[in-house]
Design a protein with these regions (language model features):
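Bacterial N-terminal signal peptides that target proteins for export
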Residues: 1-6
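C-terminal motif of bacterial Sec signal peptides marking the signal peptidase cleavage site
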Residues: 14-17
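Bacterial Sec signal peptide processing site at the extreme N-terminus
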Residues: 19-32
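Short, well-ordered alpha-helical segments enriched in acidic and aromatic residues
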Residues: 46-59, 63
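A short gly/proline-enriched turn/hairpin at secondary-structure junctions
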Residues: 61-71, 82-89
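Surface-exposed, charged secondary-structure patches
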Residues: 75-120
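Short beta-strand segments and strand-loop junctions that repeat across beta-rich extracellular domains
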Residues: 124-133, 157-160
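Low-complexity, intrinsically disordered terminal/linker segments enriched in charged
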Residues: 138-171
Length: 171
C-alpha cells in the first residue's frame, strides 16, 4: 500500500508541476490593437479630445519629439487641449506596423512608421489589456532622419540641445 501511494504521489507532483509553455493565441488581440491604434490616430486627426485621451490608461506617459516632452497623461492633456479646441491637431496614418506580446498575452508593444505632416515619423509604445479593451500605457513619437542627413540636423539642433544637456546633467 505504501509503494502504491508513493507512486501516485510522485505522479501527481510531476504532472502538477508541468507548465503549459504554449504561448496564447494573440491573433485576435493583434487585430484589436491595430484597430485601436487606427482609431486612436483618427480621433486625434478629427480633434476628438475625449475619445483620443480615452485610449490612454489613467497613468499613461507620452514622450514627444522634443527632448523636453515627457508627460504624464494629465500634463499631456493640458498641453494638447488648445490644439483640439482649435481643431489644429495632427493627422498620423500608419504605413508599417509591428505588434509583439508578452507571454501572458495581456501586455503588448508596438512600433510603426507614420505618414504625418512632419513626413515619416515613428510611433512606438506599450499597450495593456484593461478589461476587454487595449489601452496605451506609454507612447513615444520620434521623427526619422535619413542617415545621410544626420550631420545637417545635428548642426541645426546643437545650440538648443547643448543647453538642455547642460541643464539636465547639472541636476
Amino acid at each position: 500500500m505504501g509503494y502504491r501511494f508513493l507512486s501516485v504521489l510522485v505522479l501527481v507532483v510531476l504532472f502538477g508541476s508541468c507548465k503549459n509553455n504554449v504561448a496564447p493565441d494573440t491573433s485576435s488581440d493583434k487585430t484589436a490593437i491595430a484597430a485601436m491604434l487606427d482609431s486612436f490616430n483618427r480621433a486625434a486627426a478629427n480633434a476628438e479630445y475625449d475619445r483620443y485621451f480615452n485610449f490612454y490608461t489613467v497613468d499613461a506617459v507620452f514622450i514627444g519629439t522634443d527632448a523636453t516632452e515627457n508627460w504624464d497623461k494629465k500634463s499631456y492633456m493640458a498641453w494638447a487641449k488648445p490644439y483640439f479646441d482649435k481643431k489644429t491637431t495632427w493627422n498620423f496614418t500608419s504605413i508599417d506596423r509591428h505588434i509583439f506580446f508578452d507571454k501572458t498575452g495581456t501586455l503588448a508593444w508596438f512600433d510603426e512608421l507614420l505618414s504625418t505632416q512632419m513626413k515619416i515619423c515613428r510611433g512606438s509604445g506599450v499597450v495593456v489589456k484593461v478589461g476587454n479593451d487595449w489601452k496605451v500605457q506609454q507612447y513615444v513619437l520620434s521623427t526619422t532622419i535619413p542617415n545621410s542627413q544626420i550631420d545637417t540636423v545635428v548642426s541645426i539642433k546643437a545650440a538648443i540641445e547643448d543647453e538642455l544637456i547642460k541643464k539636465l546633467t547639472s541636476k
